[in-house]
């Protein structure tokens, strides 16, 4: 499956107009923003977990980044309320679930295999910086080599 795979092109997506698509596991739905591959793919998605839902244990061969938009996301490493950014490095694995339900912005398979740092940031209590244009604020989240997430 290929959706918005030309990363050299600028793109604006109104995610509210995209349909929720069921994932392979009950209670977990996705809005696909970008995808290059089938079920295991480089992907950018909005993922919604129903209350008391879970995803089976899996490994992220080229890493995972997510930002919790609503609710509380959980795995065996911790609980992540709305506003939490997490970078799970290449080769990491987890068994995600939620008691209350949650919505995430997720990027998969973008990280350098040599980037081994796990990052967890509470964006709601972090110090944001003035951006390059008036009214823009920026929060650096992760950096490795030439890749930066803010």
Please state what every model-predicted region is:
Residues 69-72, 85, 141:
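A structural feature that tracks compact, well-ordered secondary-structure segments
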Residues 74-94:
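Short acidic-glycine-tyrosine-enriched beta hairpin
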Residues 44-47, 150:
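Short, well-ordered beta-strand segments enriched in hydrophobic/aromatic residues
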Residues 45-46, 55-60, 77-78, 96-98:
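Short histidine-centered beta-strand/loop micro-motifs
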Residues 38, 56-64, 95, 147:
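Short, low-complexity cationic-aromatic patches
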Residues 50-53, 59-75:
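Glycine- and acidic-residue-biased ligand/ion/polar-headgroup-sensing regions
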Residues 1-39, 101, 105-149:
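A short, N-terminal "cap"/entry segment at the start of jelly-roll beta-barrel domains
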